[in-house]
Amino acid sequence: MASLAALALSLLLRLQLPPLPGARAQSAAGGCSFDEHYSNCGYSVALGTNGFTWEQINTWEKPMLDQAVPTGSFMMVNSSGRASGQKAHLLLPTLKENDTHCIDFHYYFSSRDRSSPGALNVYVKVNGGPQGNPVWNVSGVVTEGWVKAELAISTFWPHFYQVIFESVSLKGHPGYIAVDEVRVLAHPCRKAPHFLRLQNVEVNVGQNATFQCIAGGKWSQHDKLWLQQWNGRDTALMVTRVVNHRRFSATVSVADTAQRSVSKYRCVIRSDGGSGVSNYAELIVKEPPTPIAPPELLAVGATYLWIKPNANSIIGDGPIILKEVEYRTTTGTWAETHIVDSPNYKLWHLDPDVEYEIRVLLTRPGEGGTGPPGPPLTTRTKCADPVHGPQNVEIVDIRARQLTLQWEPFGYAVTRCHSYNLTVQYQYVFNQQQYEAEEVIQTSSHYTLRGLRPFMTIRLRLLLSNPEGRMESEELVVQTEEDVPGAVPLESIQGGPFEEKIYIQWKPPNETNGVITLYEINYKAVGSLDPSADLSSQRGKVFKLRNETHHLFVGLYPGTTYSFTIKASTAKGFGPPVTTRIATKISAPSMPEYDTDTPLNETDTTITVMLKPAQSRGAPVSVYQLVVKEERLQKSRRAADIIECFSVPVSYRNASSLDSLHYFAAELKPANLPVTQPFTVGDNKTYNGYWNPPLSPLKSYSIYFQALSKANGETKINCVRLATKGASTQNSNTVEPEKQVDNTVKMAGVIAGLLMFIIILLGVMLTIKRRRNAYSYSYYLKLAKKQKETQSGAQREMGPVASADKPTTKLSASRNDEGFSSSSQDVNGFTDGSRGELSQPTLTIQTHPYRTCDPVEMSYPRDQFQPAIRVADLLQHITQMKRGQGYGFKEEYEALPEGQTASWDTAKEDENRNKNRYGNIISYDHSRVRLLVLDGDPHSDYINANYIDGYHRPRHYIATQGPMQETVKDFWRMIWQENSASIVMVTNLVEVGRVKCVRYWPDDTEVYGDIKVTLIETEPLAEYVIRTFTVQKKGYHEIRELRLFHFTSWPDHGVPCYATGLLGFVRQVKFLNPPEAGPIVVHCSAGAGRTGCFIAIDTMLDMAENEGVVDIFNCVRELRAQRVNLVQTEEQYVFVHDAILEACLCGNTAIPVCEFRSLYYNISRLDPQTNSSQIKDEFQTLNIVTPRVRPEDCSIGLLPRNHDKNRSMDVLPLDRCLPFLISVDGESSNYINAALMDSHKQPAAFVVTQHPLPNTVADFWRLVFDYNCSSVVMLNEMDTAQFCMQYWPEKTSGCYGPIQVEFVSADIDEDIIHRIFRICNMARPQDGYRIVQHLQYIGWPAYRDTPPSKRSLLKVVRRLEKWQEQYDGREGRTVVHCLNGGGRSGTFCAICSVCEMIQQQNIIDVFHIVKTLRNNKSNMVETLEQYKFVYEVALEYLSSF
């Protein structure tokens, strides 16, 4: 019964479970339906753990009681009672299918409780390799019957594979897992995607390997795709691209491959219908190649290396498709590679002297195929020449004995070698010998050269060198700073002693160490032959300029030894002193003054006189002598007035035999005459061997008293006439011849006296009539006399036994000088009250002495028709010549040679024509300046210039044309060759629109050929400019100083109105030109007219000074013999005369600042005899030379329409000085009563005007605005009676015509009210506004000619100076006004100019300044009190320092 039941159940189940679809279909080898034993299909099972294994079940043959077991014939595992994870394997036979095919099977999961019985995994093992991970699996709940699954397998011959079914149990989950109907189909699966052939992937080590899995089938988002490694490691895949609806692809990468990455990989996909498995593809990892040996070095250069790569022996895989060289510096981090395509390779563009590391890189195919660099070749390139020498080399510190250089720091980029040297080479010339030296520099960018010589021109350069070469910097030429100089050579000090003077000269120090600027000489008396001499004050100090290596010390005490300590100075200070001693000669005793020559008592045979002791001078009085001289008829009164001392003793007894007119009546010892006492001449006594016989009653006598001093072999004598005694009157009728002679002498004396009185009276009257001033004329007369007396002074010093020289007078070639009486037989120095006539002023660095030249014979031949003119007759002569009655300037000028008078063949040569500005003003052959010939140019010796003789100075001048562009270099060659220290320029660069001269001087430094010219200083003055240069020639260490005197006030046409400015210019040139310098170079445009005027004036001033005469005609004639047409027009010829006349009338009135205080008291002291002073004489001369104003000179002010604009018609502004108004004010004219005035420094610096009238206030403010006036100085009080009312706004603003004046501020400082206004032209607002200060000086009462306080007026001047410095840059003008624009305004302008002169030139010349002001306005400084006041303010100004 039981068996029947089972059978029935089995049948029932068969009926319930439908058969497997296609269960009995035919399949390829490897399939199995399990109807027979599975081994018949080639299947096998592997016994699992604890007997867990696959069993073949055939329920048809053996039914199963458990309903969970399906019916049929199949393979199954029973997981009941199994531990979790137990596995059972069913192995299919090995298959060798080629290409893609399908394996499908059915599986069945069942359990009683419907829980999962476990898992079913399917493995595809290829070529007997590892099992790996399952390609398909299922787990979970039981299935609802048999479920079909597909395996799409892609394999390719000769590979084979084996499918393994694995059952995995789950603990506590009993059930059954069955597999049935396994088929191997020769076509792709219906549902499961299949893969195309997976290709092998070859990569290089370290690269990412990418596998691309291409599947056929339909992609579903639920499909799972992965890459399965041979050893079973899975990597998920992502579909990257769907090709079409039946094909898709996915990629996966194996990152950072290495040899351990070498393996086989296949693609696996799991879909709802099953799994697809690709073939295994191999991942091949190649090792990039590396050379075994380093490259071989073949050759080395500075910027290249030749190498051989040595790439045949390698480590790694080939093939080698690329060879590269990698190189880098051993100290750097960068590397560079070059492709090598030849057996040897040259590395270019390397850096010199750098160590390189060179390796070879080999590359095989594929990304990352370049292997690591091979072993390195380490080598160093050679050094290369430096790129350039040191750059931007400059001197940053210059000292006397050292220089500090600085240059642009450089490194390897410049040196191109790590081993280099930096050297400084320098050379200089010392004592005409060239020295060269070099020093190695250790610092990087600066170096100090030490041990140099001061003030030395040094040429230096830096040298940068390395083993391969060297480069130099640009040459620098620098001069070390000055140092204190060495000592003046003691042996060079020479002294010429006189009585009260010592002339001392010396040579500069051997080591000047710079430009000697000053010499300081300290002197003091150290002993005297005269024990009574007070030497306490005999000391002092003088300073001499660099070009004055001599000095005449005056005011010394005779017979005294002086020590002189000399030291030189540069800009750095004084050097060591050197001391010498020189003694003055003894002087004749100083004789006392006798009020009258009337004797105390007189008889027929005696005369009693008073004897006074003499004052010793340098040596004690040795003896007194009383001399009696007989006066005879043949001696004129003039000759008798000349006192002659008696050096040869003659006794009364010897006088007759020697026919001597004099005899010694007595000789007294100094002890015998201690005090004043009477002495009777003719007392018939003997004194020290000399008989004093009675006098003859019939003779006339002169009684002389003389004193002698003897010391050191010298004998000096001085004498005085004590009395005269006439012959006695006889009562007999017979007249003795001696009486007659004596009476004749007396009568002649009386007549001569009367004649002299009449002549003097007529001279005074003539002087007044001609308005000449004796003081002015006497300047040149006295200078001439001084020269003669100085020349003859040496003859008058007596030796021990020399006879007394008689005074001599050297006569001029054209007239006789008057004789001068002298009370001393030895005249070594001329002393006069005039300050311009001191023997030689003691100089400091600020003084301005004017040198004189030694008088010699006249250098110009005197024509008998044009004789030289005495200075005293010059005014009369010029007046007569200007009248032109019969013979005047016109005829005299026409008598001069005109045009060419000598050959000028050289100037006419074709090669020299372009060197001449004008074809008719060229150089004579005989006097032309010949330049040194330049190499290769025989015509380079020509320049249009001629030597011109001066007064006793051959070739003292060079007259030349103004340089042209082609001749500038030649001009400077001439300056250097001739050693000229002064250039006089009497033209402007452009006149009337025409170029008269090219600018041939630099603003800073310029090189003309081989001459380097550097501007040092510019001193602008009102009428001329002084520029100071240093001049240096290439190859010479000498640096010379040169001054260019540029006279800027010569008008474009004609001549200057007055010679005042030109005379000051001439004196300045004369003073500043060193005596040892070469010719003064003078030029205008052509080098004829103005040039000749300057030379003629300078020459004639020298003649007037030395001889008291002038010879202008013959001077010009001689000038024209040396250069054509010097003094070119009659107008210039007359101007030369006028200039000389003004110089003679006015004299030289300049006073050095250092002497002003002492001289001022002398010139202001009243002479009791004349009741005058030199200042008064100056002012009288000033009135004489002040130009008379003619009506035609002030024609504009005289126009009727301008009458009401003038306070007075007496003094009107000159037409040429008028400031015409520019701003338009209705119908008002452009006239204002004002004049432009020069200051000392600035032309037209002042605008002098009257106090504005009510109808001219607008004109006044137009003047202020139009002429850029920054200051207004008001010097008068407001007075309504005089129509002097306020013309400015107070606290507000006001309009005056077109000018708006706005009050800004005001303050009061003692006597000064200081206001500030802002003004603008309302008609031209675009011009902006200007700031103007208004200085109202209230300290000058109306009733006084001068203000009571000099200090307060100086405060106005200082306020004006300060304002100009701070606000207008000294460019604005100053309006100065008083009531009439005359005396007060002129006084203020003169004071301002004097202050400027003191500051700029250290001299005071009040006369010159006032004369300059009066040339433009005749009422400037109206009274003597105002003129004196200017002097007094100058003294006050000096006291403020």
UniProtKB/Swiss-Prot annotation:
It is a single-pass type I membrane protein. It comes from the Eukaryota. Changing residue 453 to C: In a gastric cancer. Residues 1-25 form the signal peptide. Residues 889-1143, 1175-1437 form the Tyrosine-protein phosphatase domain. Residues 769-1441 are cytoplasmic. Its main location: membrane. SUPFAM superfamilies: (Phosphotyrosine protein) phosphatases II, Concanavalin A-like lectins/glucanases, Fibronectin type III, Immunoglobulin. Changing residue 1237 to L: In a colorectal cancer. The keyword Transcription regulation does not apply. Disulfide bonds join 213-267. InterPro entries: ConA-like_dom_sf, FN3_dom, FN3_sf, Ig-like_dom, Ig-like_dom_sf, Ig-like_fold, MAM_dom, Prot-tyrosine_phosphatase-like. The active site is at 1084 (phosphocysteine intermediate), 1378 (phosphocysteine intermediate). Changing residue 248 to S: In a colorectal cancer. The chain crosses the membrane at residues 748-768. Keywords: Disulfide bond, Glycoprotein, Hydrolase, Immunoglobulin domain, Membrane, Phosphoprotein, Protein phosphatase, Receptor, Repeat, Signal, Transmembrane, Transmembrane helix. It catalyses: O-phospho-L-tyrosyl-[protein] + H2O = L-tyrosyl-[protein] + phosphate. Belongs to the protein-tyrosine phosphatase family. Receptor class 2B subfamily. This is Receptor-type tyrosine-protein phosphatase T. It comes from Homo sapiens. The gene is PTPRT.
